[in-house]
A protein has these predicted regions:
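Conserved MFS/SLC helix-loop-helix module at the cytosolic interface between two early adjacent transmembrane helices
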Residues: 65-104
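Helix-breaking motifs and short loop linkers at transmembrane-helix boundaries and internal kinks
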Residues: 44-46, 78, 99-105, 116, ...
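Paired small-residue
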Residues: 89-96, 104-112, 313-319
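Helix-loop-helix hairpin linking two adjacent transmembrane segments in secondary transporters
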Residues: 105, 135, 142-188
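Structural signature of the two symmetry-related core transmembrane helices
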Residues: 81-95, 286-301
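Cytoplasmic helix-loop-helix junction between adjacent transmembrane helices
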Residues: 109-150
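Juxtamembrane intracellular "pre-TM" segments in multi-pass secondary transporters
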Residues: 2-10, 193-223
Length: 406
C-alpha cells in the first residue's frame, strides 16, 4: 500500500495540504461563484453585456500579470508575508466588490481581487516545492487537484442559489468570509517554508535573461500555445454561457449552476482519459486527439445553431465536450511547456500561466463585445477556437526537432 505523502521534517505539524488545496480552490471559486449573476449585473447597472464581461476579463488579466511577479517576490521575501498580503488584499477587494455602487467600481475591485487570488495560487505551488520531497510532490498535487475539482462543480450551483435567494452581492460576501478564514489559519498555522530566500530573485537582469530563454524556445511555444488556446475555448463558455442560457434561451437562473457543473464534469473525465491516452499513444498524438475533440465540439455547436436549434439543452453537451478536450490538452501542455527548463521552471510556469490568462482576456473581451442577444456569436467563437487549437496542435509540435520530442 502506498504511504501518504508527508511533509519534510519541520513542517509536519502544519496543515500544509489543507492550505495548499484551499489556496488552489480560490481561483475557480472567485469566478464560478458569480457566473449566474452576470445577466443580473447588466440589468442592475443598466450596462451592456460587454461591460459586465470586463469583471471577468480584467480579473484574468490581473491574475495573469501577477503571476510574473509574485513568484520572485516570494523567493526573495518568503511565502508567509506574500500570501498574508495577498489574502488581505483579496479580503478588502471582495468587500469592495460587494459594496460596489457602479459597474466601474466592481470592475476595479475584481482586478484587485485577482491580484490577491493569484498570490494564494502561486504560493500553494511554491509550498509544495519547499515542504515535500520530490517523490511526494506529484502525489500532493494530484490529491489537491481532486479537492480543487469540487470548486468548479459546486461553485456555479451555490452561485445560482445565492443569486436567486440573496442577490449578486452575496457571492462576494462568501469570498470575503473565505478569505477571512484563510487569513486566520495562515497567520496561526502556516510556517515560513522558504528556508533559502534569494535576495537577487527580483533583479531585473536575471528575470529578463530567464524570460528570453523560455520565450525564445520553440519547445515552449509548441505546447504552451495549444494549451492556452484550449483554455480560451473553455473561457468562451465561462464568459458567455450565462448570458446566452439565461437571457437568450430562457434557462431559469436556478438551473444554470447544474448545467455549468455538467460541463465542468467533462474536464474531470478528460483528465482521466488523458492519462490513458498518453500512456498508449505518447505526447504528440494525445494532443492531436484532444485538439480534434476541441474542433468537433465547436463545429457541432455551430452546426446546431445554423440548423435552427434554439434550446438551452444543446449547450451543456457542447460544454462537456469542450471541457473534456481541455482535460486532455491541459496536462500535456502544462508538463511539456515547463519540463524543458529545469533551471527556469518557475519562469516557464509563470509565463505559461500569463499566456493562458492573456488568451482568456482576449476571448472574454470578444465574447462580450459580440454579444447581440442571439446564440450565433458564441457558436462562431467556439468553432473558431476549436479550429485554432486543431491547427496549433499539429503545426507547432511538428516543428520540434526529433531529438527534442517528449
Amino acid at each position: 500500500m502506498t504511504e501518504p505523502a508527508q511533509a519534510i521534517p519541520g513542517f509536519q505539524a502544519a496543515p500544509l495540504f489543507f492550505l495548499i488545496a484551499v489556496f488552489l480552490m480560490l481561483q475557480p471559486l472567485s469566478t464560478d461563484l458569480y457566473l449566474a449573476s452576470l445577466p443580473s449585473l447588466a440589468t442592475v447597472f443598466a450596462v451592456p453585456a460587454s461591460t459586465v464581461q470586463l469583471t471577468l476579463s480584467l480579473f484574468v488579466a490581473g491574475f495573469g500579470g501577477a503571476q510574473l511577479v509574485i513568484g520572485p517576490l516570494s523567493d526573495r521575501y518568503g511565502r508567509r508575508p506574500v500570501v498574508i498580503a495577498g489574502l488581505s488584499l483579496y479580503l478588502l477587494a471582495s468587500l469592495l466588490c460587494g459594496a460596489s455602487q457602479s459597474i466601474g467600481m466592481l470592475i476595479f475591485a475584481r482586478f484587485l481581487q485577482a491580484l490577491g487570488c493569484c498570490s494564494a495560487v502561486i504560493i500553494a505551488r511554491a509550498i509544495v516545492r519547499d515542504a515535500y520531497a520530490p517523490q511526494d510532490s506529484v502525489r500532493v498535487i494530484s490529491k489537491a487537484s481532486s479537492w480543487v475539482s469540487a470548486a468548479p462543480l459546486l461553485g456555479p450551483i451555490l452561485g445560482s442559489f445565492l443569486q436567486v435567494h440573496l442577490g449578486w452581492r452575496a457571492a462576494f460576501v462568501v469570498h470575503a468570509l473565505l478569505a477571512t478564514a484563510l487569513l486566520i489559519m495562515v497567520i496561526a498555522r502556516l510556517p515560513e517554508t522558504n528556508l533559502y530566500k534569494d535576495p537577487k530573485a527580483t533583479e531585473l537582469s536575471g528575470l529578463a535573461r530567464n524570460y528570453r530563454i523560455v520565450l525564445g524556445s520553440p519547445l515552449f511555444w509548441a505546447y504552451a500555445l495549444p494549451g492556452a488556446l484550449s483554455y480560451g475555448s473553455i473561457f468562451v463558455f465561462i464568459s458567455g454561457a450565462s448570458f446566452v442560457l439565461i437571457k437568450v434561451l430562457a434557462l431559469p437562473t436556478g438551473w444554470f449552476g447544474y448545467c455549468f457543473a455538467f460541463g465542468v464534469s467533462g474536464y474531470l473525465s478528460g483528465t482521466v482519459v488523458c492519462r490513458r491516452l498518453h500512456a498508449r499513444f505518447g505526447t504528440k498524438l494525445t494532443l492531436r486527439i484532444g485538439s480534434s475533440l476541441s474542433l468537433a465540439a465547436g463545429a457541432i455547436f455551430l452546426a446546431m445553431v445554423l440548423a435552427g436549434m434554439q434550446h438551452w439543452a444543446m449547450i451543456p453537451p457542447v460544454m462537456f465536450m469542450t471541457m473534456g478536450a481541455h482535460g486532455i490538452n491541459f496536462p500535456i501542455s502544462q508538463s511539456n511547456s515547463v519540463s524543458p527548463f529545469p533551471q527556469q521552471a518557475g519562469t516557464a510556469a509563470g509565463l505559461m500561466g500569463a499566456l493562458y490568462m492573456l488568451v482568456a482576456f482576449i476571448v472574454g473581451t470578444i465574447v462580450g463585445g459580440t454579444h447581440n442577444g442571439t446564440v450565433y456569436p458564441l457558436a462562431i467563437i467556439a468553432c473558431s477556437m476549436g479550429s485554432l487549437i486543431f491547427i496549433a496542435a499539429r503545426v507547432l509540435p511538428a516543428m520540434i526537432p526529433a531529438e527534442h520530442t517528449v
